[in-house]
Amino acid sequence: MKQVSSGRLRSAKAEDGAQLLRLWALLFDEAGPTSDEPWKGHAREWFARYVDDARNARFPVIDLGGPLVATAIGTLEVGVPNPQCVRGRTVRLANVITLPEHRGQGHGTMLVLDVVAWARSIAADRVDLSATPAGQRIYERLGFTVTSAPRMKLVL
């Protein structure tokens, strides 16, 4: 892996919202954002609500001095304490994305490590994520393990 050169990891600011939305859209459409789908309005509102809430959300970005090239999201989920999550505090790592032309430079690793450090700083018990096949190897290298319980969902 190449070293990150001239990239600066920083926290997203409110004015980064449009750029983050563009990056998040790439997760769902590798060809790039094409329309103002309904989720985008909700995502804008959600980001505006949580961008400055360091107790419940973390938005690291890689800034090379132009448009943002990479980002990730960490959000705190509080549930019932249990033997595997003694305080009931889980950070959900999501939307880890680097622009294709900037991949392989360590940006994603920096973002994940930043969210993990934030999770420790807020006394979370663990960090959970859903990995793509391409990303699984990277997460395993950073200490994440595959769980025995499959993720499931019910779309409402």
List each model region and its residues.
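Conserved acetyl-CoA pyrophosphate-binding loop and the N-cap/start of the following alpha-helix
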Residues: 102-114
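Conserved GNAT acetyl-CoA-binding A-motif
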Residues: 112, 119-131
